[in-house]
Amino acid sequence: MSDPLGDMLTRIRNAQRARHAVCVAPASNLRANVLDVLKREGFIRGFSKEELRPGVAQLRIELKYNDGEPVIKEITRVSRPGRRVYSKIKELPRVYAGLGVSILSTPRGVMSDVEARTANVGGEVLCRVF
């Protein structure tokens, strides 16, 4: 798999379109950090890490719906393995005039665009969520 984060985002997108309550993806620290931001911003209900066997784990993602409609309307990968996208804090665009969130990987960890502006730090733009 050349883009593990992109794979997880696609699994979430497909599960929400199929109205599944839970989605499963292989575990990694980056994926868990991105899910933590999605939970803080209210896009998912929660997630947990399940150990399948020693050294192999998966993330169980609890998706969130509002009156039967998915909370996540759009989730897209911005920075890809073949084309990395970096942004300074002053050049960081707002997603749908602040209704959506960009998730960044910064020297201070993975955080939302709002948290990055508060911390005055830029970084790699991983994805956009609306």
From Swiss-Prot:
GO CC annotation terms, alphabetical: ribonucleoprotein complex; ribosome
GO BP term, example: translation
One Pfam family, short name: Ribosomal_S8
Keyword Membrane belongs to the record: no
Keyword line: Ribonucleoprotein, Ribosomal protein, RNA-binding, rRNA-binding
Disulfide bond annotation, renumbered to this chain: none
Keyword Ribonucleoprotein: yes
Domain of life according to the entry: Bacteria
UniProt xrefs under InterPro entries: Ribosomal_uS8 (IPR000630), Ribosomal_uS8_CS (IPR047863), Ribosomal_uS8_sf (IPR035987)
GO molecular function list: rRNA binding; structural constituent of ribosome
Function: One of the primary rRNA binding proteins, it binds directly to 16S rRNA central domain where it helps coordinate assembly of the platform of the 30S subunit.
HAMAP family per UniProt: Ribosomal_uS8_B
Oligomeric form and interacting partners: Part of the 30S ribosomal subunit. Contacts proteins S5 and S12.
NCBIfam families linked: PRK00136.1
Family under the similarity heading: Belongs to the universal ribosomal protein uS8 family.
The protein, known as: Small ribosomal subunit protein uS8
Organism: Acidiphilium cryptum (strain JF-5)
